[in-house]
Amino acid sequence: MDNKISTYSPAFSIVSWIALVGGIVTYLLGLWNAEMQLNEKGYYFAVLVLGLFSAASYQKTVRDKYEGIPTTSIYYMTCLTVFIISVALLMVGLWNATLLLSEKGFYGLAFFLSLFGAVAVQKNIRDAGINPPKETQVTQEEYSE
């Protein structure tokens, strides 16, 4: 696979961070202001943390496989399974919650925005490491001479 072209875009990186932080803050503010028991808030918080970790870990595993970095199938399948479980837990929790439909949609959108942000930020961090900005490349070339 010689067609591994990864580009780093500062604009996309900034938007990714905004999506990640915005999704997490929105989700947590919704939990903070929600009129639900503390154990329910803990459930939704744990689902968010599980989803963020599994999404970033799954993206990294897929990227490692694409770049030819050895990964085990068991870890790949574990990441995928945990990601699916986190989404299913949120869906089941919202389905059974005594919330308004608009509140359920709010939590769902904030959750998926956070997952997108986590994957995009992780991708951008990795791309920045592979293709550093040109100023950094010039500096490294000067030191190697």
Swiss-Prot record:
Signal peptide: none
The keyword Translocase is annotated on this UniProt entry: no
Pfam families: YiaAB
Membrane-traversing stretches: 13-32, 42-59, 72-94, 99-121
GO terms for biological process, alphabetical: DNA damage response
Membrane topology (UniProt): Multi-pass membrane protein
Keywords: Cell inner membrane, Cell membrane, Membrane, Transmembrane, Transmembrane helix
Topology, Cytoplasmic side: 1-12, 60-71, 122-145
UniProt topological domain (Periplasmic) ranges: 33-41, 95-98
GO cellular component entries: plasma membrane
InterPro entries: YiaA-like, YiaAB
Subcellular location: Cell inner membrane
Database matches in PANTHER family: INNER MEMBRANE PROTEIN YIAA, INNER MEMBRANE PROTEIN YIAA-RELATED
Designated name of the protein: Inner membrane protein YiaA
Species, as recorded: Escherichia coli (strain K12)
